[in-house]
Every structure is written in structure tokens, then in C-alpha cells.
Amino acid sequence: MRDGKKLRLGYTTGSCAAAAAKAAAWMLLSGSKKESIRLLTPKGMELTLAVEDIHLSPNCVRCAIRKDSGDDPDITRDTLIYAEVRKTETVGIVIDGGQGVGRVTKPGLDQPVGAAAINSVPRRMIQANVEEVCGLFGYIGGLYVVISVPDGETLAKKTFNPRLGIEGGISILGTTGIVEPMSEQALVDTIHVELRQRRESGADYVLLSPGNYGADYIKGAMGIDPATAVMTSNFIGDALEICRELGFRGVLLIGHIGKLVKLAGGMWNTHSRYGDCRMDILTACAAAEGLHGGAAAEMLCCVTCDDALRLLKEQGLYDAVLHRLAGRIDDMMHYKCSDIETGAILFSKEYGYLCETKGASKLLRRIKED
């Protein structure tokens, strides 16, 4: 809800690309125009989307789906996402990016260097939906699918893509296929309600985590029910202040280094639109431990935290820098909430457990007992 109004859902660029590809494949194999197309998203919600700007020929069809972001602020709102599908002599479905879809130029991202920046889930959606159409028409030949975004190169300048090493356009993204509107106050209010419920039920200690990565780690590496944790999204600072106001005795934060490293720089809202200081902070910690010259410059240019950690291992500074980072996060959390116990545990998808602040293990034991 926002100002008493129920917020409207949207759909991702990945859903648009998959729907456009499905519609183009249907028209190519049927020889008829299709004005709308149904798409089942990974979230389980079915969409019926209008098909726009149809160009139909015997061996190739091009069409578009217009991006609807719902009530979420999004630079791709109303952008046309195109798919062109053509028959090929080779068996199988090949997916590529065309105009306005970025190309990966640095390692460490969802797709390999040289590939179109169409992430894994959208690729699977495109593949599955085109295969569905092929099965419907009994087609066993090959298809070449090209996703394009005519405005993509211009839009990409407003994103972090150029810095991440994605050049020439936007990324085709989405894990659920659905865009859920982000009303900041609504999210903070939800966090407050959940924390108040925990406190009123008698909990003195609480576990926080930013989101799905943290929940997966809590379950897989620690054997704790993820429902034990309160999800903070990017609002870590707000969540800590709410914990203090409600009278919790202690708070443990478990999260991916890509989020929690920002706390060392005093960034309490970790959304990328407020800035991206991950490599700056890691490089500063590394410099304090002796990293200098070309290696420091290389770290500043790393795309992901795992890339930076790999460099630290090569330089023999891995443990020292993580220890310093944990100390810095400990200082900042204590400054934020000096009257309650605070702790943090950091992990990465590639390296698993990384480091923890002083007292984090004790807090974890108390949360398990609470």
C-alpha cells in the first residue's frame, strides 16, 4: 500500500523477452498474426500481454512486448522489448542479444564474457516458451532468437552496467518474472510489524538478513529455519533502529558481503541507487593491510566482491582484510546501536563463510536458544 492505495505489480524485462520470443515463434510457425500472448512466470503468475509492432515474413518474425513496471520506479518503464525469431538449418534453439542488449566484457557476472547480458532465468524462460511453441506445432528444426531493445544503449547509461563491464545496452533481468513495487515506507513498516511481533512474543535476540541469499545461507550452512530471520531488504539501518526502539537485547545480521560491505562505509540503505562503494571500501581495507600500486588499482576495477576476494587470496591478504572489514562493520554497528549487542556474519556465494564481528557467535547461540 502507498497512501492508502494498493500498489500495482509489473513484469520484468525477462518476462517481456520471453513473451516476445514466444509470440514471434508462434507466428513464425503458424503463419498467422497473434495480438496477445500468455506467459507463465517463475513466480507462478500467468500474464496475458499485448503483442506490438509485428513484422511477419515466411522465415522470420519480429515483435515486441511493452515493459510495464507497475508502481515501481524503473527506467525501463514503457520500453519495447523485441524478439526476432528465424528458422535455421541447425537443430536447437540459439538465444542471443541484438541492438540495445548489453555484452558482457568482464568475468564474474551471470553470463560469460562475450555473451549477451540476458541473465540465466530469462534465458530459461525464453528457451522453455519457444520449446513449448515448437511442440505445439510439431516443429523439430532450429530457431535463432535475438532479443533487442532499441532504446537500450541510451537507457544503460543510467544504470551501473558500464561500470560492471556490460557494454552497449541494458541487461535482460528477473528471477520471478514479476516486478513488485518498492514503497520504501511500506517495506519499513512491514519490517517494524514483524520485529514488534517477535518482541511481543518474548524474543530478546533477533536474527536479521537482507534477503534470499541470506535466507539460503542460514538454511544451508547453519541449519537454521530461514523463517527465524526477519528480512530487511536494503533497509538495514532502519531495521537496527527499530530493534533498538523495541528493546531487543541483541541483533545478529547475516548477509552476503556484497550488501554488508557497504555498512563499513556507513551506508545503511544498501540499494544501488544510493551508491556503490563496495570496491572502494574493500580496497581501503586492503591498502591498510599493505596492498598498493597496481594490485590496488586492479581491485578498484573488480566487478564483484568474489573477484576482489580472489585477488586478496593471490596477494596473501585474504584473512587480514576480512578481519579488518569485520572490525569496521562492528564499529559502525556499535555506533548505530550502542545500547544493544550487535553482530554480523558475512559470506559469499563462491567462498562461503568469510568473517564475523566480535560477539557474533555468542549472539548466534542466544538466538538459537531464544
Language model segments and positions:
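A structural signal for small-residue-enriched, beta-sheet-centric alpha/beta enzyme cores
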Residues: 8, 164-170, 175-194, 198-324, ...
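Flexible, glycine-rich phosphate/dinucleotide-binding loops
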Residues: 154, 215, 353
